[in-house]
Regions:
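Soluble non-transmembrane domains of integral membrane proteins
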Residues: 1-230
Length: 231
């Protein structure tokens, strides 16, 4: 939920964006072709103070000889969150790992103040198209795929959005698909494969935005992200 924004004008209840009741969630990490998504089983969390007063939360876990660390760096003023995923191996065999990010939800309409329901859907930005809507019907008709340098992916609704923004100097494979059994749509991207060897580590960093459509803040985070704003 967003602490500084209320559901009703003058109300005390915070506005909820990511909501398990709508099956609306975001995640990042690694997967392998043999094991699928690697489950970190986080068992430890610590908090520290970073540069300019930023709150940093670090989660740590271990599964089958692989250590996981997720560092979450919260912006003091804005709604952008820097996320660093790191894995270290104590396994003798080399493992090919793929960094990924994901936003997943169903197509339930979003209830807003005044009982108004507004547009909800995915948007992609790439070198091919700086602002490409690919709605729920499009995804059902055909899964989305586009390989591009930089870019970003977002789920937008009236006034608010969630978005993942990767390393702009690297190439990423953007995707969207529908899981009929679960009734959920997922959008995201994968980054370049890495070889995880014994004693080595792989790090992936991304920016996650969850909050209102603030043009200046969005433009400062990444080029064309302010195109998500309704004028």
């Amino acid at each position: 939920f967003l602490k500084n924004i209320s559901l009703e004008k003058g109300g005390e209840d915070p506005f909820v964006v990511l909501d398990p009741n709508n099956s609306y969630s975001a995640n990042s990490g690694f997967y392998t072709r043999s094991q699928g998504y690697l489950r970190p089983n986080f068992s430890k969390i610590s908090e520290s103070l970073g540069v300019n007063g930023k709150n940093i939360y670090t989660l740590e876990g271990e599964t089958n000889g692989i250590s996981f660390k997720k560092k979450i760096e919260m912006d003091v003023v804005g709604y952008g969150i820097k996320i660093f995923d790191e894995i270290t191996s104590t396994i003798n065999d080399d493992i090919t790992v793929t960094p990924y990010v994901l936003i997943e939800r169903d197509n339930s309409p979003v209830k807003e103040s005044g009982l108004m329901y507004t547009y909800l859907g995915p948007v992609f930005s790439s070198t091919r198209d700086t602002y490409e809507k690919y709605d729920f019907d499009d995804i059902k008709d055909a899964p989305y795929q586009n390989k591009t340098f930089g870019g970003w992916v977002a789920f937008i609704q009236h006034y608010f959005l969630t978005a993942w923004i990767p390393d702009q100097s690297a190439e990423h494979l953007y995707q969207a698909r529908y899981n009929e059994n679960r009734g959920k749509y997922s959008v995201g991207y994968t980054s370049k494969d890495s070889i995880l060897s014994y004693g080595s580590k792989v790090v992936s960093s991304n920016v996650f935005y969850v909050g209102p459509k603030l043009p200046k803040q969005l433009a400062n985070i990444e080029e064309n992200l302010d195109l998500t704003v309704d004028y």
